[in-house]
Amino acid sequence: MEERKIKAVAIAAALLVSADIHAENEPVDIHASPKSETSDSDIAAVPFMFSTDSMGLSAGVAGVVKKAGQPQASLLGAGLVTDKGTWMTYLGAYNYALSPGSRWLFGAEFYSGDYKDFNYYVGKAAQNNSHADEMIIADAQEALHQLSARYILPIGQAKHDPIKAALYPSRKLTGHTPWESGVSSIDLRPFYQARKFTHNTQLPPSDFATNDSVWGLETRFEWNNQDRSANPAQGSKTQFKLTYAPDTSDQTSWWKWELNQSWYWDLGKWDNLFDQQVFAFNVYTADTPSWNNADAEHGYHRPPEYAGVKLGGLYRLRSYQTGRFVGRSAISYSAEYRVMPEWQPLGDWPVFNWYDVPWWQWVAFADVGRVADSYNVSELHSSMKWSAGGAVRFQVEGVVVRTEMAWGDEESIFRVMVNQPF
């Protein structure tokens, strides 16, 4: 079972209210009056309980407010406690605008957790040639706080009415460049991240920085040219991230870049069996160019492991736990064959018939990738790790829920999550 399950739940819940999963039959009216939208706010809260070996018996609650003061804005809160003493809290605010015609969208996320007897891969245990039993079991406090200021560029389909263009759940593809089609944006995200082990934890030697907290700025450049945000069948999505942490008395400067590229091809129907077939392909690669830079005062200009380039988790190498592999650089490939069966019985099933479930999807997927201590294309394509699996996904009240099983060299993992992985 995924050792960091609750952190994944928090992140997934945040995605639930993001711009990418507005209900396809519920477009955002950003020009509605604040008074009417506030009175029509959608509020929901869900208690949950689960048990795993690492977490113990866990209980919590998550709540969401859509149209929170503005028609396109949302709020999310989540928290849990366990019988082992672990606790987690999460609070997020998304898509707030200065005015309906503004090109800026603002948000914030605040996550804190105190974890007891958790599995961590640090030092050599996080390298590509490591083994699963090299983990340590430790207590740690973790945090990730960040603000977001997203500017929607006046090109492509966002030349006019930028917020609607960015948040509308579907769009017509009108070209193959950012100037012709899709929505392009720049997102500035100042952040603070920390992982503090208890004082009696014996940590192995590591090639990374040893500071237990870091702050800096993440800048995202994104071009979204998907035909639909919830379940794309055509187009592409490109995201390039630059993360920089400055020199301070408590940390050394470092920077890294990440490129995440996805494509989608509509393969059409298959007789009376499948209403839709889609082949989706994703490439992710990243590097830390400051890795070998050094000076007498600070040593090597490298991030701490928890802020480094990682593989494993919800989106890449899905048969491994989150952050299983960490290095200077990484490359990862994912392929999915997604089909929508013509047979759709969910509306007649117990529990499902309480909700609007317009479609479901069957998926076969495969991932390969690895981390390395240099950005060497040949090395990054040797001794690659792999994952393969299957998934069933369905849209519930406008939200894509994915249940998937992944197998790999070390273990198999079953997950329930929201949103497409790419």
Where are these regions (language model features)?
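Transmembrane beta-strand segments that form the barrel wall of outer-membrane beta-barrel proteins
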Residues: 42-51, 61-63, 72-81, 236-246, ...
